[in-house]
């Protein structure tokens, strides 16, 4: 093995640094260190000729100048892996940033790993149960698959991610890894404290490439988190839930790096290698014969343009799309998942079974009919609908409320005990609502419950009988509209 030789900086242009080595030119992805204490980290991305390499700085380049000595570390960027990383927060270099004690006993592993070979991949299409009714029934996730979570600010995206972490730990005895790419420092701190209060921190790892860091660090933090996830899958034989926020920021960081490196931009200014870079990250997320990495990724769609190259390349890797609706969030229907916009490739009769598939299709059909009838209701009122259409509206509104669910991670805010609902209980509840078994129950009896059997107890304790409540106005408060009975559907959807 060649002994790394010292080099010297020959040019600095922003985050791009050219270094001269008289012998033993470092290979691609080698990590170089400069500065008095080696605090400036540079990753080699190109070999310009026999003497020069070009790299991108993963740290601020303040204090770097021509002639500064550079040390070749002799290897790629590495991060710690093992049980010791659980409950800790790291940056792209694997340094702890939670103000806790430094790691003592750990092993290092390169962030640049090859995807698992096809021979090791599991070809079974297995359902990944989340314990969340709306997801498990209408858009089931794939074990070892990738789901995109589309949502703006304030619609419950972080709460949904937090609940998935909670359920993964309790239900699967797995490990959860949160990867913040371009994450705001404030959001990262809030999430850390939320996880700590929810009691899920002992079985999770958090890795952040914050918004104020150079593009090189944001570009590599996803690979660092995946390396930790692969250890738990391959060495510990455990299931891993990987949450990425936001995958668009990974592409954006790659675009910045590409521009700094002088590459010719592609469509809309994106890097010409975007497809390859995204595939290198996404293809490592897979289920093997030893375990699975299931990924939930927040996806930002620029200007709501689904033909944007970043969105197109991301969609090609996703097995499920979960769309959060601001309108449903404003009505208090949490989780605010839009059942008509969301979809999953796992929702097929050969995978979930004929009963599950038929129920999901019937639920979507009911919601679609309800959407079409809303305009008529807002203009003419519910009384102008035929008896059959009124039944459709009643079923849809009861299904909407049954698919809401109190979360464990929001108990301290709502005062409601969290519910983990099995797929069988969720399907049974939807089926009984579609059969009109609960047509005499007030809608609010189905709101924020777990299994359908809880509706009877809630109706007795909180509400008057349906025959009396039909003649009464909805209860005042923020949820008045959403708790309205079918007779008040016109009021609830005037806007």
Where are these regions (language model features)?
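Acidic-enriched and Gly/Ser
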Residues: 1-5, 12-130
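Conserved glycine(s) of the Walker
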Residues: 156
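Residue-level signature of catalytic and energy-coupling elements of molecular machines
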Residues: 9, 14, 67, 89, ...
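Conserved catalytic/coupling modules of large nucleotide/cofactor-utilizing molecular machines
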Residues: 231, 249-250, 256-495
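Conserved P-loop
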Residues: 159-203
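P-loop NTPase nucleotide-binding/switch module
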Residues: 68-70, 77, 97-145, 150, ...
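Loop/turn-to-beta-strand initiation segments
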Residues: 173-176, 202-205, 237-241, 290-295
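Phosphate-binding/switch loop-helix module in NTP-utilizing enzymes
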Residues: 138, 218-254
């Amino acid at each position: 093995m060649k002994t790394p030789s010292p080099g010297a900086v020959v040019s600095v242009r922003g985050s791009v640094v050219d270094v001269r080595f008289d012998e033993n030119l470092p290979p691609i992805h080698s990590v170089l260190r400069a500065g008095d204490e080696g605090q400036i980290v540079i990753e080699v991305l190109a070999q310009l000729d026999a003497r020069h390499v070009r790299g991108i700085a993963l740290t601020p380049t303040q204090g770097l100048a021509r002639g500064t000595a550079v040390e070749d570390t002799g290897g790629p960027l590495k991060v710690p892996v093992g049980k010791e990383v659980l409950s800790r927060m790291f940056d792209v270099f694997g340094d702890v940033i939670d103000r806790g004690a430094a790691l003592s006993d750990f092993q290092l592993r390169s962030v640049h790993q090859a995807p698992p070979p096809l021979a090791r991949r599991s070809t079974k299409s297995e359902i990944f149960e989340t314990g969340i009714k709306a997801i498990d029934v209408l858009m089931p996730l794939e074990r070892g698959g990738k789901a995109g979570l589309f949502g703006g600010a304030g619609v419950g995206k972080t709460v949904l991610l937090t609940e998935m972490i909670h359920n993964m730990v309790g239900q699967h005895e797995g490990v959860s890894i949160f990867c913040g790419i371009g994450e705001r420092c404030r959001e990262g701190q809030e999430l850390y404290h939320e996880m700590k209060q929810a009691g899920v921190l002992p079985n999770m790892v958090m890795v952040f490439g914050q918004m104020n860091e150079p593009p090189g660090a944001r570009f590599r933090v996803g690979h660092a988190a995946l390396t930790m996830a692969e250890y738990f899958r391959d060495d510990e034989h455990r299931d891993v839930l990987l949450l990425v926020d936001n995958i668009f920021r990974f592409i954006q960081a790659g675009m910045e790096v590409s521009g700094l490196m002088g590459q010719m931009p592609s469509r809309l200014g994106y890097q010409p290698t975007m497809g390859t870079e995204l595939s290198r990250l996404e293809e490592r997320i897979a289920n093997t014969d030893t375990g699975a990495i299931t990924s939930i990724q927040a996806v930002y769609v620029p200007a709501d343009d689904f033909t944007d190259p970043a969105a197109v390349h991301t969609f090609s890797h996703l097995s499920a799309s979960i769309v959060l609706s601001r309108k449903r969030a404003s009505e208090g229907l949490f989780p605010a998942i839009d059942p008509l916009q969301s979809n999953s490739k796992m929702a097929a009769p050969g995978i979930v079974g004929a009963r599950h598939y038929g129920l999901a299709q019937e639920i979507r059909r009911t919601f679609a009919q309800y959407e079409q009838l809303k305009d008529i209701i807002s203009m003419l009122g519910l009384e102008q609908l035929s008896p059959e259409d009124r039944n459709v509206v009643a079923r849809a509104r009861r299904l909407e409320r049954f698919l809401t669910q109190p979360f464990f991670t929001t108990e301290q805010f709502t005062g409601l005990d969290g519910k983990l609902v099995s797929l069988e209980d969720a399907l049974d509840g939807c089926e009984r609502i579609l059969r009109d078994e609960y047509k005499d129950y007030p809608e609010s009896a189905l709101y924020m419950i777990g299994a359908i059997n809880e509706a009877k107890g809630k109706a007795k304790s909180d509400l008057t009988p349906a025959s009396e409540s039909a003649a009464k106005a909805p209860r005042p408060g923020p949820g008045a509209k959403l708790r309205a009975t079918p007779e008040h559907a016109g009021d609830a959807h005037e806007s």
